[in-house]
Amino acid sequence: MYLPQEIIRKKRDNKELTTEEINFFIQGVAKETVSEGQIAAFAMAVYFNEMTMPERIALTCAMRDSGMVIDWSHMNFDGPIVDKHSTGGVGDVTSLMLGPMVAACGGYVPMISGRGLGHTGGTLDKLESIAGYNITPSNDVFGKVTKEAGVAIIGQTGDLAPADKRVYATRDVTATVDNISLITASILSKKLAAGLDSLVMDVKVGSGAFMPTYEASEELAKSIVAVANGAGTKTTALLTDMNQVLASTAGNALEVREAIRFLTGEYRNPRLYEVTMALCAEMLVIANLAKDEQDARAKLQTVLDNGKAAECFGKMVFGLGGPSDIIENYDNHLESAQIIKPVFADTTGFVHAMDTRDLGMAVVGMGGGRRVASDTIDYAVGLSDMIRLGQTADNQQPLAMIHARNEEQWQQAANAVKAAIVISEKQPEATPEVYRKIRPEDV
């Protein structure tokens, strides 16, 4: 028998907690015998003193086991259960192509996703822009769609990692969000509760990333790889670039359109293509669905070319309550904005830098994201035809097309877009799409 305050005192004094102490504390969080004040004190103690890898693994497992852990064994899947998690960015629509692409190559992708908060878009908000799509199906429907389509993207249910919900809500109001140990446990407790065989992490780097510096992003990626593997789930991470909007679009219905056009081959933004392929290839390799990256990329290109990946997306949407013809007639099922006009730079020159976070906030400002969790979303608004770093902006080449509800909203967004993009006489150095891969042996 332990006392919560003694566990807090021990961490406050920078001593290592045992697995039993961590389990006791987190069970108390889930059962609500540990108060919000005690959670806050614990989070602050961890914030200042960090946790060792064994502590992080124990915290992650305790939070994972605080609720239901999905067991897929009764489904008799004939392939591995794989998933991807991204730390979030702007125009980061990879999940919508990646799930179907991996499914078409023989993996099963039961993806439990989040909503957008702050400047980052949320996969669930994007999917909810499709009329009828149900992000909260029963467990039976979730399993059935995963089996039949190979992929199902849904929202987090209250039964998964309930301790994380309480800890996160407290961290959010006590300035303890940005701590590697707590972030690692929060991300992984939810992901590992989904009963995965393997996981690939996409950790963003740059002006639109969650972590402020390359070093911090790398540290988070290493922590996640070490902890997930320590908790028994084969995991690797890719550090990918978020110094510019990843896709050509940012906004909910706009990104769904881009994902469908990508899957059918109508249009594939080259940076989005490279990041999506790199993540998918890593998923196939660690799940033993491909020999190596080259083999994986060949398989992925095949399912894009023969339409199998697009078919998996269509099956998922229909299975979760959406229209049966989303691939063929997507424009019939996705909202469009009333005003669609280009915004031009005030000077001519190269696009030297972008404040990707501010571009994300421009979409939020139009109603395309949330400032607080209770906000409703306008699915139609956003940016499309985004200019890329190194391209020339002039009176022929706009910075973006702005999709707005009215003229006033368009003008505000236009000012925000111009302020977020730096035009210069000299061309910027090219940034890679993928900086590095972190495998278990690297940590």
From Swiss-Prot:
Major enzyme class: transferase
Pathway info: Pyrimidine metabolism; dTMP biosynthesis via salvage pathway; dTMP from thymine: step 1/2
GO cellular component: cytosol
EC code(s) of this entry: 2.4.2.4
Keywords of the record: Glycosyltransferase, Transferase
Protein's GO biological process: pyrimidine nucleobase metabolic process; thymidine metabolic process
GO function terms (MF aspect): 1,4-alpha-oligoglucan phosphorylase activity; thymidine phosphorylase activity
Record keyword Chloroplast present: no
Keyword set includes Glycosyltransferase: yes
Assembly and interaction partners: Homodimer.
Family indicated by similarity: Belongs to the thymidine/pyrimidine-nucleoside phosphorylase family.
Identification of the protein by name: Thymidine phosphorylase
Organism: Aliivibrio fischeri (strain MJ11) (Vibrio fischeri)
